[in-house]
């Protein structure tokens, strides 16, 4: 992928590379303020919360989806590790993929991997506003000959802005905005669809009720601006239960709201978090 074609992408990657230096050089203004984290993950959005230093989190997101072309399933596995209290590295693997197309044989196999990082500025202003910047790079290591994966390398910078409401049981609303630049780097069958750059956005909220967390997301992704035909929007209600300080479990049912969206999805969630020291 030629970065001179995408000056904004070049600037975002430069900022991403400077984040670790900034994290060590930034004056410590809000570190003494403890920001509650009633929830660790959402189902189809990134949250602003970072892992603390030497804290590691394992998350499993099994999912199933159905649309006019067939059925799909995957077992997304994610690892997050805190380098500092504000800077974390991320590893994701699509796990085992399964596709049952309406026309064609059923196919299955391992998916792609993603690596990246995220830096968070917590407790800004009055202490209830947070901001983070991150970037993920998807590497096309999955099989392409059978069409299970598409052979794209993808660069996915994103930002998240969140606002807490302590008077409402530490509930939160957030906005995420991101880009997805794609470039086909592996040979694929001639019938494969070309790749288009896309814009993604997520708006969501969660509300803690005892050990339960009610969640709601509106998730969008659009590549029409780059010549594609996809405009996906999902309404994603979900619920998460805090089994303990280290364990969470949940389920969500994203509902497609546009013609190009899946008819429906089911997303599971299992999280384990612990400190290494």
What name fits each language-model region?
Residues 25-277:
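Transmembrane beta-barrel domains of Gram-negative outer membranes and organellar outer membranes
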Residues 1-35, 276-277:
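Cleavable N-terminal export/targeting peptides
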């Amino acid at each position: 992928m030629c970065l001179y074609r995408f000056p904004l992408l070049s600037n975002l990657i430069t900022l991403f590379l400077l984040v670790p230096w900034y994290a060590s050089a930034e004056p410590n203004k809000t570190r003494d303020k403890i920001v509650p984290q009633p929830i660790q993950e959402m189902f189809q959005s990134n949250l602003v919360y970072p892992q603390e230093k030497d804290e590691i989190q394992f998350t499993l997101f099994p999912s199933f989806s159905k649309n006019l072309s067939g059925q799909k399933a995957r077992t997304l596995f994610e690892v997050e590790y805190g380098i500092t209290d504000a800077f974390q590295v991320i590893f994701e693997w699509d796990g085992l993929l399964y596709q049952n197309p309406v026309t064609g044989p059923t196919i299955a196999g391992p998916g792609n991997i993603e690596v990246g990082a995220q830096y968070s500025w917590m407790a800004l202003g009055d202490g209830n506003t947070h901001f983070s910047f991150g970037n993920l790079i998807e590497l096309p290591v999955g099989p392409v000959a059978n069409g299970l994966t598409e052979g794209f390398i993808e660069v996915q910078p994103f930002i998240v802005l969140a606002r807490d409401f302590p008077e409402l049981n530490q509930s939160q609303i957030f906005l995420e905005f991101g880009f997805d630049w794609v470039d086909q780097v592996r040979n694929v069958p001639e019938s494969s669809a070309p790749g288009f750059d896309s814009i993604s956005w997520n708006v969501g909220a969660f509300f803690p009720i005892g050990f339960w967390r009610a969640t709601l997301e509106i998730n969008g992704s659009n590549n029409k601006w780059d010549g594609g035909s996809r405009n996906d929007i999902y309404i994603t209600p979900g619920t998460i239960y805090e089994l303990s300080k280290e364990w969470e479990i949940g389920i969500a049912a994203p509902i497609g709201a546009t013609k190009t969206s899946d008819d429906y999805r089911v997303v599971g969630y299992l999280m384990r978090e612990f400190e290494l020291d």
